[in-house]
């Protein structure tokens, strides 16, 4: 429509100028230019562009130059069509994005479901654990027949039983390594999980007040018998920190027992010597009192 308006206005202005120029010359024939001729040429042009005849009819009835406001309706219609088209495209894009989000969400849910299935754990009852521990005490590596029999008796699958024994052996190896490194694992509860020679179950640790009491006893013995001080100093660690009844290697227990025996023998011999010295001192005092 804008092209049609520009063409009509341009044609009318050009023909008007040509007519005025010819009249001014005086010699030439004056061409009669009418507005209808311009409109007819514009009509032909509009048919080529596909414009409706109603718009040209409005221009013919209005007269004068081609008013632009007559084409406002067509421009508004075009804008509405463009707006509807754009809205449809936006809606289509939103729908596609929504579908993609739903697909991604469904994939994430599937992945989470797979992870949850992999992390499924079996909660054993106390009876099942007792049976498993009893068989583990007998052998750490049960064969397929033993696992199958145990699984049927406990109502578990053979795979679950096999996995339990694998985890149990791993736990036992870990405890063995810690015991070899001298790491004290726990308190009064025994490590009945692992039964490996030459190690035995570990007992409770000595309390701090017991250590203080042992130190006081050591100081009292050293003060009463000064001649035993070197022996007590040599074996002070064994007296201050007596070995627990359980939890140390047999070699360490034997060494501490031999050290205690040496200290006891030294104390016994020294006590005999001290008693003889006391008797001699008393006899000397008695002789002096009698004036002998």
Curated annotation (Swiss-Prot):
Motif SH3-binding: where in chain: 242-249
Function of the molecule: Controls fundamental aspects of growth and development.
Lineage of producing organism: Eukaryota, Metazoa, Chordata, Craniata, Vertebrata
Keyword Glycoprotein among UniProt keywords: no
DNA-binding region listed in the record: 117-176
Keywords: Activator, Developmental protein, Disease variant, DNA-binding, Dwarfism, Homeobox, Nucleus, Transcription, Transcription regulation
Species this chain originates from: Homo sapiens
Family, as annotated: Belongs to the paired homeobox family. Bicoid subfamily.
Main location: nucleus
Molecular function terms from GO: DNA-binding transcription activator activity, RNA polymerase II-specific; DNA-binding transcription factor activity, RNA polymerase II-specific; sequence-specific DNA binding; sequence-specific double-stranded DNA binding
Reported disease: Leri-Weill dyschondrosteosis: Dominantly inherited skeletal dysplasia characterized by moderate short stature predominantly because of short mesomelic limb segments. It is often associated with the Madelung deformity of the wrist, comprising bowing of the radius and dorsal dislocation of the distal ulna.
Domain of life: Eukaryota
GO cellular component term, pick one: nucleoplasm
Entry comment describing in which tissues the protein is expressed: SHOXA is expressed in skeletal muscle, placenta, pancreas, heart and bone marrow fibroblast and SHOXB is highly expressed in bone marrow fibroblast followed by kidney and skeletal muscle. SHOXB is not expressed in brain, kidney, liver and lung. Highly expressed in osteogenic cells.
Induction comment: By retinoic acid and phorbol-12-myristate 13-acetate (PMA).
Signal peptide start-end: none
InterPro entries attached to this UniProt entry: HD (IPR001356), Homeobox_CS (IPR017970), Homeodomain-like_sf (IPR009057), HTH_motif (IPR000047), OAR_dom (IPR003654), Paired_homeobox_Bicoid (IPR052631)
Designated name of the protein: Short stature homeobox protein
Note: The gene coding for this protein is located in the pseudoautosomal region 1 (PAR1) of X and Y chromosomes.
Gene Ontology biological-process entries: positive regulation of transcription by RNA polymerase II; regulation of transcription by RNA polymerase II; skeletal system development
PROSITE patterns per the UniProt record, alphabetical: HOMEOBOX_1, HOMEOBOX_2, OAR
Motif OAR, chain ranges: 274-287
């Amino acid at each position: 429509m804008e092209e049609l308006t520009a063409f009509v206005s341009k044609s009318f202005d050009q023909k008007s100028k040509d007519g005025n120029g010819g009249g001014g010359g005086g010699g030439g024939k004056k061409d009669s230019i009418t507005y209808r001729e311009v409109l007819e040429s514009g009509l032909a042009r509009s048919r080529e562009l596909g414009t409706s005849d109603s718009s040209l009819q409005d221009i013919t009835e209005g007269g004068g130059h081609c008013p632009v406001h007559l084409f406002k309706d067509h421009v508004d219609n075009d804008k509405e069509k463009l707006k509807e088209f754009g809205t449809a495209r936006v809606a289509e894009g939103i729908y596609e994005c929504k579908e993609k989000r739903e697909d991604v969400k469904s994939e994430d849910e599937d992945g989470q479901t797979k992870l949850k299935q992999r992390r499924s754990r079996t909660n054993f009852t106390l009876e099942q654990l007792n049976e498993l521990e009893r068989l583990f005490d007998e052998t750490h590596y049960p064969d397929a027949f033993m696992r199958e029999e145990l699984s049927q008796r406990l109502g578990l699958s053979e795979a679950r039983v096999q996995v339990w024994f694998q985890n149990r052996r791993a736990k036992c190896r870990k405890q063995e390594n810690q015991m070899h490194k001298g790491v004290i694992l726990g308190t009064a509860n025994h490590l009945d999980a692992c039964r490996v020679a030459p190690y035995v179950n570990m007992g409770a640790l000595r309390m701090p007040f017991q250590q203080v009491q042992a130190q006081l006893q050591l100081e009292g013995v050293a003060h009463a018998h000064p001649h035993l001080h070197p022996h007590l100093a040599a074996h002070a660690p064994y007296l201050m920190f007596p070995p627990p009844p359980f939890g140390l290697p047999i070699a360490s227990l034997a060494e501490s027992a031999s050290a205690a025996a040496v200290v006891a023998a030294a104390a016994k011999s020294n006590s005999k010597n001290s008693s003889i010295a006391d008797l001699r001192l008393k006899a000397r005092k008695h002789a002096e009192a009698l004036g002998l």
